[in-house]
């Protein structure tokens, strides 16, 4: 089984069977919190654990996109990106789920994609026509699916708990 994780707040988790068939596609669980300035969203960490826990102990290979700072990105934005990535890695470690990190340029190049999110969505729709990717904003779902597909196609065999590539 391969699980693809696009780790942003408005992203997704895709679960593929050992044959590469889509088993589940989940939006990242988030909480909306009230603040003195309005509201903000953050990761629902217990929700992340509940989402991944059923796959613990199975022959599972998790592929997570490696988050990195981008040129011109603000300090707060960089912090949020790293914080979210760290939460995901912490959840995977706590659940003892083996994982591989991959930079966006690596997996996208391997699948013949560029930086365009719409191209990723269209490619995912070709590979998985049953997936609900109709909206342009479903690029996070599409990228999670493609990360899982990349793992299934390129990295092959599952790993054992505690192993990391």
Task: Go through the PLM ranges and name each one.
Residues 1-165:
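Phosphate- and other anionic-substrate recognition elements at nucleic-acid/protein interfaces
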